[in-house]
Each structure stands twice: as structure tokens, then as C-alpha cells.
From Swiss-Prot:
Keyword Lipid biosynthesis: no
Species of origin: Shewanella sp. (strain MR-4)
PANTHER family per the UniProt record, alphabetical: SEPTUM SITE-DETERMINING PROTEIN MINC (PTHR34108:SF1)
UniProt protein name: Probable septum site-determining protein MinC
Record-linked Pfam families: MinC_C, MinC_N
Function: Cell division inhibitor that blocks the formation of polar Z ring septums. Rapidly oscillates between the poles of the cell to destabilize FtsZ filaments that have formed before they mature into polar Z rings. Prevents FtsZ polymerization.
Family membership noted in the UniProt record: Belongs to the MinC family.
GO biological process: cell morphogenesis; division septum assembly; regulation of cell division; regulation of cell septum assembly
Keyword list, A-Z: Cell cycle, Cell division, Septation
InterPro entries xref list: CAP/MinC_C, MinC, MinC_C_sf, MinC_N, Septum_form_inhib_MinC_C
Gene expressing this chain: minC
Entry superkingdom: Bacteria
Subunit structure: Interacts with MinD and FtsZ.
Amino acid sequence: MSKPSLELKGASFTLSVLHINSSDLNAVMAELDSKLAQAPQFFLGAPLVVNLSAIQDNDFNLHGLKELLLSRQLVIVGITGATIALSNQAKTLGLAIVKAGKQSVTPPPAPRQTKVLKQNIRSGQQVYAKNGDLIIFGAVGNGAEVIADGSIHIYGALRGKAMAGAAGDSSAVIIAHSLEAELVSIAGQYWLAENLQQHSSDKSGCIRLNGESLIVESLPL
């Protein structure tokens, strides 16, 4: 029997959500450009859901926002939290109306294994610890990426990007002897360098989630 030419299957994907808090597109783009400049490769070509719950102006220029994001190689796949008028505008632009999913009461499975590296991770290199924690005895240089479904422990300086809880584990942490990162992320919540500098002074620390916000705690290393 021949295989069907198509199949419809359920699947879940992790999408970044861009919260728009102002109707002033010039102000929105200026702030976005500042964030993109700090981590351009992290957002390049990224599919986005735009949250418009803070926008009550039914004349908001959604088409203009879409074009401005496309010019920066960001792709809107849908909107959420919009008024009826803005939802109708989105439909004419071919955008999906995304409803926020219910929060799962089942915690993600605990990491099953640990990946240990005794080396520096240099610019352009990427390391991924699937289904587990990542321990690095060395530094993570600028332009390098370290990713783990569990926690990330760096016994050295973190100057690149570190993304823990990549599969949704909100209990994951990022620990480093020196926090100088370009970007840190836990379960999709992220800080860019400017956010990290506001909360840390390049010293050893542990970054974790507190609710839906990241916090950093000093470590006596």
C-alpha cells in the first residue's frame, strides 16, 4: 500500500513572543534594533508571535510592524492578545490568531545525563547537552554558544551565550565563575548583556528563574 502524500500530526514548538507595549513603531523599532545589535544571530530568521495585549488602539499599524520586522529578518507567524479589530487586520495579512495555551501542571522530566567538557569553547562553536546538564571546565568565549536541556555549570568565564532549560525545564540554572555573557536564557526567558550588567558585576553567580523573571545570586567561589 502506498504511503499517503500528506499527513496531519500534532506537534509542539517553542516560539519567541514579542510583546508590543507602544503604538509608536519608531520607538519600538529603535529599542528592538538595540537588542538585535547585541545578539543578532540569536534572533536571525526567528519566527515570532506578537503579543498585542497592551495595544488598545484599533488603528495600530500591524502591516507596518510586519514589514519592519521582515526587514530585520524576523518573521511574524501570528498574534495573540489582540482586540477584535486588530485580529481581523491580522487575518487580512495572513497571520494566525494564537491563543495562549494552558499552563501544564506536569513538570518536564528531569535531565537524565550530564555532558562534561574540559576545554574552552571558542567563538563560532556550539555545544548542546540534550536531555541533560552541561559542565564545562573552561571558558566560553565571545560568539560561542552553550545549550542544555538541563542546567549549565561553567568553571571559568562565560562571555558568549548560554541557554539552559532549552526543552522547557524552568528549574534549570546557569552557574559561572565570571558572568560576562552576551545572552543568557532559561526555559525561553532571556537576558541580553545590558540586562545582565544591571544585575551582576562580572563576578561568580547563579542565574535562575523566579516565577517568569530571571534573577542572579552571588556565589562564594
